Amino acid sequence: MTYHAFLIKYAEIGIKGKNRGRFEEQLINQIHIALKRCSGGRPVRALTRAGAKHDANGFTIDRTSGRVFVNCPDEYDYDEVVDALQHVFGIVGICPVHIMPVVPVEELCAAAVRFFGEEYEDRKVTFKVHARRLAKNYPMDSMEVNAEIGAAILEAYPETRVDVHEPQVMLHVEIRERIYLYSHVIPGPGGLPIGSAGKAMLLLSGGIDSPVAGWMCAKRGLRLDAVYFNAPPYTSERALQKVIDLAAIISRWTGPIYLHNINFTDIQLYIYDKCPHDELTIIMRRYMMRIAEAIAGRTECEALITGESLGQVASQTTRSLAVTNAVCTLPVFRPLIAFDKEDIITTSKRIGAYDTSILPYEDCCTIFVAKHPVTKPLLGVIEQHERNLQEQIDALVEKALETDEILVVGQDEQRILKTREQNLQEGM
């Protein structure tokens, strides 16, 4: 069967009321970006008027009558296009569409029978025809078209039967300026279009949890920047590359991510020297949050995202999280807070991050770990011990921010946008 277009199905966007148009525009923009990878350099046009003509040199995105269609060029890679669309948040279903000219009902019935036969080799199925007559000059209404096509399929394939309540096959027929036939629904990722919910800063480590947390927030429409806390020479270049690779995996859904590589070594060593060792983790986390929030303020991020899960480790008890939160003014999103580890691993595997996450390269969070970390820290006690850091900590934090190395990480690119030296020179 030749598919000339894909119907894009969405769920939540359709109930956004007066804001629906804005969400649709953001969805179309993300589809536009995704299809650029499939167009071989050909243009991708986004059109909103009814009856927009197909551009033979590339893909056309057509929004009309409550539908979004991706019209395809004469030659394209079906699997590549489906894969691209399955990485666009906001899409819940992708329907391959066969398009034909408007013809009399007899010819339409014959075409529908051929379409049904090619789509379903096993004809022992129940089906229902669902017609929409948007072209009001067509001589039959929707119910009459349903009856004619249904009768034709039953006659051609007597092993089938009609079930209007729970059919195994739903054959859709839309009569517009042309006739659209479709049946299969390929699942999309769901969620909301990237950018529709604002922008947030992900604290990205090399573990399993934080990439999943970032992916889940991106699925709800957040555009992501990320910050990684590096601790050379205690962490290796391979640990940094692992985080870059994880950012690249997430970018399949989000587009390019600005990854801030922060040298955290001097801060960690200073905390290790000045503070009780059972409080190392919680105090280090508090300074990570301070630095992440400072970068968020520079980059117009409206929230922080972490991969914390309640009770998973000592720093993720209720009291520990409350003490960590006390240094933040931005909201902190923890989408994994009630997830079991197995749930997180399942999602990590589904998004393709797991094999990279389990590579054996330590990050800064695993280097300076106390044997018996405090699980019920008291905010007043932690703040008192942080006063031991007053002599140098502000200067060390400022140095870490001034030497922030910014990388742009995408599916096809990994490049340094600003080196530590460039940032330092700009701060002088």
Question: Would you name each region that the model predicts?
Answer:
Residues 148-153, 190-197, 268-269, 273-346, ...:
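Active-site adenylate/phosphate-handling loop in enzymes that bind or generate adenylated species
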Residues 312, 360-368:
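Small/polar glycine-rich anion-binding or flexible loop at a beta-alpha turn
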Residues 202, 226-228, 261, 306, ...:
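Structural beta-sheet core signal
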Residues 1-201, 211-257, 326, 374-379, ...:
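RNA-binding accessory domains that recognize and position tRNA/RNA substrates
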Residues 352-360:
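A short alpha-helix-loop-beta-strand transition element characteristic
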Residues 207:
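Conserved G/P- and acidic residue-centered "switch" motifs that form tight phosphate/ATP-binding loops
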